């Protein structure tokens, strides 16, 4: 899905949704160690675990919202794949021009200082896809930028 003005630079994270399943969190924690970042979202708790150059994100439903609706419809498991892009605005413009179905026509703020946008699941055979653009000075999951600040 690369274009002339943008490209996918790697897998940013894989997200797993659950409804407060300690077994899921314990399994991820035993494999990857403690989460580097924990954030409250609207109706969910997000934990980011480092997995080499990528992350595993767990989304725990804590109330009504997108994660709970996903769980009601599909149950626990893979929520989405997130690909890192070098330029999210040209990516969205290019994908829209190609007729790729988008959930977000404009990028919005994401975790860890990123800008994000979601493609409709129909764009990739029923799998929800997120595009992620890292900030100019990427931060690690603990909130420290690469310069050590």
For the regions a language model picked out, list residue spans one by one.
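Amphipathic alpha-helical segments
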Residues: 19-35, 91, 95-98
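Structural preference for beta-strand elements that scaffold enzyme active sites
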Residues: 13, 55-58
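Short, charged/polar surface micro-motifs in flexible loops or helix N-caps
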Residues: 52-56, 63-64, 88
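Vicinal oxygen chelate
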Residues: 1-7, 10-20, 47-50, 57, 69-149
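A general secondary-structure boundary signal
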Residues: 13, 21-25, 35-37, 46, ...
């Amino acid at each position: 899905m690369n274009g002339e003005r943008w490209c996918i630079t790697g897998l940013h994270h894989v997200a797993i949704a659950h409804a407060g399943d300690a077994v899921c969190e314990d399994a991820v924690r035993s494999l990857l160690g403690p989460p580097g970042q924990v954030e409250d979202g609207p109706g969910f708790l997000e934990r980011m675990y480092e997995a080499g150059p990528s992350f595993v994100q767990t989304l725990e439903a804590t109330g009504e919202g997108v994660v709970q609706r996903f769980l009601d419809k599909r149950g626990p498991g893979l929520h989405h794949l997130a690909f890192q892009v070098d330029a999210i605005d040209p990516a969205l413009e290019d994908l829209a021009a190609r007729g790729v179905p988008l959930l977000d026509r404009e990028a919005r703020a994401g975790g860890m200082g990123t800008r994000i946008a979601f493609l409709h699941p129909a764009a990739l055979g029923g799998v929800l896809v997120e595009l992620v653009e890292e900030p100019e000075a990427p931060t690690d999951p603990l909130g420290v930028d690469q310069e050590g600040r």
